[in-house]
């Protein structure tokens, strides 16, 4: 099948930002200007096309990253047709997992910044995630019409907080109520969009006299930046003191794709200004699937392998999202990295070791769908009929097996107990929760062994509220929800050597397992590490996995208050066995006995989740807010000024933050807002730890 759009004209991009930076409105405008959506969807009235789950429309926030395909020929119609696959990602901290999944399969991203709020905590998180996956970015400074908008302040914050290299390729003409249009520094023209046509028409004029000097300064900085892309461009620049439009675009493109610069644009999506030029910048500066390195993975023998982006190579794809669609059931969203696939074909899932048949193939436009027969390299599509695929699995050709790199998902920090309101709901609740856990790897479900209660865990209160809400709406299950509980952890602080023996020998076949372990603290965030240091077969090879399994099982319940144990390194260095009585179970038990004993002797401590909290408050209430955060064991990290407001950054234990929004509202007459995200685990003070242990 010849591709309608050549691969070099594909753009797989994400729109990412802090909550309320205007991301969904920006995505809506992309759909409108690319001609897909004829009525502008506004988040304010709950009608945005991208936000297709009911809760998203009610709350005005984006939860599920909808994948949408659209086409663009440039705002002046002067480009060949490009195909843009847009993934709209949530900006609320409880949904960072969605962002992580989307970034894994994107080639480039547009980061939307609020011209007033600038770099906010979630922007930093998303930026770090994009760095991790090496995603080239553009910056779109939105809401230039808002009171307090300041384009250059956002640039300074990007340098100081994100440690990045922003290069303005536009300047705003005016700001706040006076924001009229932008100066295109590449063409050195002023661009004004026409309100009557909702911004579909625009005109280019000469740059206003009052801005010419400024424009010349910033253009020179941009041209210098482009010249640094290659020796050839640098020589041209040194000879002539300037570069042609083509050379500027080529230089900026190379440096953007290499993650050396971030081109900066501005506008107001809500007022239909600037998104059109941002789409042109997506074509000019963000990579096609051909511009990014071949994707790496491992073949069936565990040897590193790769797949180049070509339809002639064997099929390989990554499943990055699972969603339940009200009409067709379970949809598996995937990104094709090489080869092609038709509906009805059989693919292999090397992670599960299973063959699967692709039923229907769908291309999504928000929640409208188009059935297609075939997808190929660079495409993002959804498949129906895959039974055992979970997020992060690879799908590949049966004869050319490859496992692409898997994704890392964060551990939940908050738990609540849920119980169905009626007996009838009991079974339905189990099905609903398992389905939701399959869709969202940062959401976990387990049964508490002691109480028999169903415990659900997630990334924050809002995350779990939405899960309970979805159980009710999509599965008809009413549930009672307990008070949120913090996900504490346990760790050790000193090294110990410890013996564990499990012996039962009273005639006949007995049990004999004997181990010596060395336990020591591991680096924070490294988790559990097992080292096999057995010499001379004192513990036979076949029993060593049983020792590791015994240790892993013991990690689930620490000795202080039964919380999971993290960041511990355990070496098996000695032991003994019995020719007849030793077996796997005996060694598993011996390891478990040694671990529990070792924990008690290794200075066990309780760890609590610390949150990065940012409060934006009118200056008059600053004292109250700071005092309140300090009373919650918060440590103030810094403050920033924005007109009329103070932004307070602090680190506060999650346990102290339940119900904070109500307190903040009453302390500031409802005028302050805050955001919060998980930062790291830290040792709980002695008095706090004792109170928690005594409660257990």
From Swiss-Prot:
Xref: Pfam families: EFG_C, EFG_III, EFG_IV, GTP_EFTU, GTP_EFTU_D2
Molecular functions per Gene Ontology: GTP binding; GTPase activity; guanosine tetraphosphate binding; translation elongation factor activity
Subcellular location as annotated: Cytoplasm
GO process terms (BP): ribosome disassembly
SUPFAM superfamilies: EF-G C-terminal domain-like, P-loop containing nucleoside triphosphate hydrolases, Ribosomal protein S5 domain 2-like, Translation proteins
Residues given in the record as GTP binding sites: 17-24, 88-92, 142-145
Domain tr-type G: 8-290
Keyword check for DNA damage: no
Subcellular location, principal: cytoplasm
Keywords: Cytoplasm, Elongation factor, GTP-binding, Nucleotide-binding, Protein biosynthesis
HAMAP family: EF_G_EF_2_B
Family, similarity comment: Belongs to the TRAFAC class translation factor GTPase superfamily. Classic translation factor GTPase family. EF-G/EF-2 subfamily.
Function: Catalyzes the GTP-dependent ribosomal translocation step during translation elongation. During this step, the ribosome changes from the pre-translocational (PRE) to the post-translocational (POST) state as the newly formed A-site-bound peptidyl-tRNA and P-site-bound deacylated tRNA move to the P and E sites, respectively. Catalyzes the coordinated movement of the two tRNA molecules, the mRNA and conformational changes in the ribosome.
Name by which UniProt lists this protein: Elongation factor G
Lineage: Bacteria, Pseudomonadati, Pseudomonadota, Betaproteobacteria, Nitrosomonadales
């Amino acid at each position: 099948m010849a591709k309608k759009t050549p691969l070099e004209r594909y753009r797989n991009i994400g729109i990412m930002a802090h909550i309320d930076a205007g991301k969904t409105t920006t995505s809506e405008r992309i759909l409108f200007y690319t001609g897909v959506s004829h009525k502008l969807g506004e988040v304010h009235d709950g009608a945005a096309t991208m936000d297709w789950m009911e809760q998203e429309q009610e709350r005005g926030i984006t939860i599920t990253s909808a994948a949408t395909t659209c086409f663009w020929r440039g705002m002046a119609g002067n480009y060949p047709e490009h195909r843009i696959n847009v993934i709209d990602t949530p900006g609320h901290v409880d949904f960072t997992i969605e962002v992580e999944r989307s970034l894994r399969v994107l080639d480039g991203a547009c980061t939307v910044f609020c011209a007033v709020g600038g770099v906010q905590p979630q922007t930093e998180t998303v930026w770090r995630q994009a760095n991790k996956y090496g995603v080239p970015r553009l910056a779109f400074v939105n809401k230039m019409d808002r009171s307090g908008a300041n384009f250059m302040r956002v640039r300074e914050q990007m340098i100081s907080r994100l440690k990045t290299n922003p290069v303005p390729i536009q300047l705003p003409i005016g700001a706040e109520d006076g924001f009229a249009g932008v100066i295109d520094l590449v063409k050195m023209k002023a661009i004004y969009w026409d309100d009557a046509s909702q911004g579909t028409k625009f005109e280019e004029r000469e740059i206003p006299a009052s801005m010419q000097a400024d424009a010349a300064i910033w253009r020179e900085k941009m041209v210098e930046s482009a010249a640094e892309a290659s020796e050839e461009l640098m020589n041209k620049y040194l000879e002539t003191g300037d570069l042609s439009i083509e050379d500027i675009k080529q230089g900026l493109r190379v440096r953007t794709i290499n993650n050396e610069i971030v081109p900066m644009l501005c506008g107001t999506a809500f007022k239909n200004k600037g998104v059109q030029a941002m789409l042109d910048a997506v074509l000019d500066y963000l990579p096609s699937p051909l511009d990014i390195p071949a994707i790496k993975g491992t073949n069936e023998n565990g040897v590193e392998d790769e797949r180049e982006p070509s339809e002639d190579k064997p099929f390989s794809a990554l499943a990055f999202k699972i969603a339940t669609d009200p009409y067709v059931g379970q949809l598996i969203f995937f990104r094709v990295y090489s080869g092609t696939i038709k509906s009805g074909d059989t693919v292999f899932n090397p992670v599960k070791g299973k063959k699967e048949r692709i039923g229907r193939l769908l291309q999504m436009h928000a929640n409208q769908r188009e059935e297609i027969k075939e997808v190929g390299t660079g495409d993002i599509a959804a498949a129906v009929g895959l039974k055992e695929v979970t997020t992060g699995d690879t799908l590949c050709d049966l004869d050319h097996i490859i496992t692409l790199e898997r994704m890392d998902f964060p551990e939940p920090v908050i738990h609540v107990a849920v119980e169905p309101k009626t007996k009838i709901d009991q079974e339905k609740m189990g099905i609903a929760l398992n389905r939701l856990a399959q869709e969202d790897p940062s959401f976990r479900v387990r049964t508490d062994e002691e109480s028999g209660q169903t415990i659900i865990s997630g990334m924050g209160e809002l995350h779990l509220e939405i899960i309970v809400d979805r159980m009710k709406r999509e599965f008809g299950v009413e549930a009672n929800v307990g008070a949120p509980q913090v996900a504490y952890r346990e760790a050790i602080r000193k090294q110990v050597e410890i013996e564990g023996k499990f012996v039962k020998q009273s005639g006949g076949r007995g049990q004999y397992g004997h181990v010596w372990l060395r336990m020591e603290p591991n680096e924070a965030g490294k988790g559990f590490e097992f080292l096999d240091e057995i010499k001379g077969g004192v513990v036979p090879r076949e029993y060593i996995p049983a020792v590791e399994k015994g240790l892993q099982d013991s990690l689930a319940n620490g000795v202080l208050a039964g919380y999971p144990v993290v960041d511990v390194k355990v070496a098996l260095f000695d032991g003994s066995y019995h020719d007849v009585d030793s077996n796997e179970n005996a060694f598993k038990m011996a390891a478990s006995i040694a671990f529990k004993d070792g924990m008690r002797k290794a200075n066990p401590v309780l760890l609590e989740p610390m949150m990065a909290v940012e409060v934006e408050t009118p200056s008059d209430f600053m004292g109250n807010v700071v005092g309140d955060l300090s009373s919650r064991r918060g440590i103030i990290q810094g403050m920033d000024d924005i007109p009329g407001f103070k932004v307070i950054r602090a680190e506060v234990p999650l346990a102290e933050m339940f119900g904070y929004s109500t307190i903040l509202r009453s302390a500031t007459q409802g005028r302050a807002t805050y955001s919060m995200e998980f930062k790291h685990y830290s040792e709980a003070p002695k008095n706090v730890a004792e109170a928690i242990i005594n409660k257990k």
